[in-house]
């Protein structure tokens, strides 16, 4: 890291102590060319200081950041925050991101959010050629199906077609 990056890191940590989610939103909206460590650090901190107002910034990171690691952390943080407003971006990443770790984490995040509307898209992701992505989508599908059954009191749902 450059010397000025350490100062930026201190500023991020100060904003974290103040629980200033808006600082992180502003930072992420202008961070594309900053070092990976700073971008990932900011995304991870939002899990602890963010509320629904940070979702759109995290969704932009998930879609546009050049690093799969940063996009993965954005998906993780969106899942931990748990807002349904992130579902569309997570579905898009799960089905279309070039990186398997991003697709995997997006499926896991959808499970964490618990929105049954993601079930059809998870069923598509079960067919992913990457085994980890496919398994993550299947686990998420099973969990959301379980939630649906419990909410409706139903006993059975159609199982997705699983490639063996």
Predicted feature locations:
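Conserved hydrophobic register position within alpha-solenoid helical repeats
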Residues: 8-11, 42, 74, 106, ...
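Solenoidal tandem-repeat scaffolds enriched in leucines and small polar residues
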Residues: 130-141, 153-154
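Alpha-helix N-cap/helix-start positions at coil->helix boundaries
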Residues: 2-5, 36-37, 52, 68-69, ...
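Alpha-helical segment of the N-proximal tetratricopeptide repeat
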Residues: 6-19, 26-27, 32-49
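Core register positions within helices of long alpha-helical scaffolds
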Residues: 14-15, 45, 77, 109, ...
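Helix-adjacent hinge/juxtasegments
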Residues: 65-84
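TPR/Sel1-like alpha-solenoid repeat signature
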Residues: 46, 61-62, 74-78, 93-94, ...
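Amphipathic alpha-helical scaffolding segments comprising HEAT/armadillo-like alpha-solenoid repeats
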Residues: 15-31, 51-64, 83-95, 115-127, ...
């Amino acid at each position: 890291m450059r010397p000025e990056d350490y100062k930026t890191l201190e500023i991020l940590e100060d904003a974290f102590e103040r629980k200033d989610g808006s600082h992180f939103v502003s930072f992420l909206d202008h961070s594309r060319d900053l070092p990976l460590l700073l971008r990932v650090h900011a995304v991870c901190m939002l899990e602890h200081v963010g509320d629904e107002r940070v979702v759109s910034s995290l969704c932009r990171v998930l879609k546009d950041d050049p690093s799969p690691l940063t996009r993965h952390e954005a998906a993780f943080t969106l899942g931990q925050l748990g807002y349904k407003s992130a579902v569309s971006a997570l579905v898009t990443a799960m089905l279309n991101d070039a990186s398997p770790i991003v697709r995997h984490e997006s499926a896991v995040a959808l499970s964490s959010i618990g929105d049954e509307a993601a079930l059809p898209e998870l069923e598509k992701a079960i067919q992913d050629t990457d085994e980890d992505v496919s398994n993550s989508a299947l686990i998420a599908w099973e969990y959301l199906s379980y939630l649906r059954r419990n909410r409706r009191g139903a006993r059975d749902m159609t199982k997705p077609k699983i490639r063996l």
